[in-house]
A protein has these predicted regions:
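Class I S-adenosyl-L-methionine-dependent methyltransferase catalytic core
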Residues: 1-265
């Protein structure tokens, strides 16, 4: 494999051999710029750097191909797709997040990608099977709609309501089942041999570490026709370290997220 040569046999992306090799790192620790109306996009508690999304899109697609985000939030995936000349469709229940995405496009002088304000379980019916070349999404967290940070009164909103009338374990089970339903339907819109990447962070809550990434990976592995291929760790250098348990107990500072990679068979 020539280090700086693009192979015509490359059916996945536009990367050279050396770029492909670098993209296989299981940890992303690149410092991404705080730009593209970051303050405005930060109204959403789970926004991702558009350049990070662009880097992932470059790994799993070629220019001009189509990307789907069934939980678009404020449009990190869509902005990333625009940066690298891909087409994208984003779906979200919350019109506020879509409005923020559109305002960012206006302020940045970028053409808007297609957005749909609806339940993904309904909106996905609009598209034929095998329409998309890549799915990139950041799933809404279980129990994160109005979660107060420890020792901090700042409240961040996610894209999914709490299951407030159920017990904690019941609500987590419902969350996992809902994620499976939506992403299972999304996968049907993905071309065979193509990939889905899912952001998911773990959580420390009520003095317990919740390995949501592992639980979600196991649940998504139940979807017929896809195979898990990797777990990429994104280390976010912008996250602050904390001393929540000091001096009595160890409590981790959550400065990473997992990116679960699946391929449609």
């Amino acid at each position: 494999m020539g280090s700086n040569i693009y192979s015509e046999k490359n059916k996945l992306n536009n990367l050279t051999g050396s770029e492909w090799k670098f993209s296989t790192k299981s940890v992303i620790n690149k410092v991404y710029p705080i730009n593209m109306q970051h303050k405005l996009r930060s109204e959403h508690g789970g926004q991702k750097p558009p350049e990070l999304c662009a880097d992932l899109i470059k790994i799993f697609t070629k220019e001009g191909q189509n990307v789907l985000d069934p939980f678009m939030g404020v449009g990190g995936t869509l902005l990333g797709a625009s940066l690298v000349n891909r087409n994208a469709v984003g779906i979200d229940l919350n019109s506020r997040w879509i409005d923020i995405y559109k305002e960012v496009c206006k302020l940045e002088g970028m053409e808007e990608q297609e957005t749909i304000c609806a339940d993904s379980l309904v909106a996905l019916d609009k598209f034929n099977n095998e329409t998309f070349d890549f799915i990139l999404t950041d799933v809404p967290y279980w129990n994160m709609d109005s979660l107060e940070k420890t020792r901090n009164k700042t409240v961040k909103q996610s894209k999914l309501n709490n299951f407030e009338n159920n017990t904690e374990e019941q609500s987590k089970k419902e969350w996992l089942n809902l994620m499976k339903r939506i992403l299972s339907k999304s996968v049907k819109k993905l071309k065979h041999g193509q990939y889905m990447a899912v952001f998911i962070g773990d959580m420390y809550r009520n003095s317990q570490y919740h390995c949501l990434s592992g639980e979600l990976a196991m649940k998504l592995n139940e979807i017929k026709g896809i195979t898990m291929k990797a777990n990429i760790i994104w280390e976010d250098p912008s996250k602050s370290l904390h001393v929540f348990g000091y001096p009595a107990a160890f409590v981790p500072s959550m400065i990473h997220q997992n990116i679960l990679i699946f391929r449609r068979d």
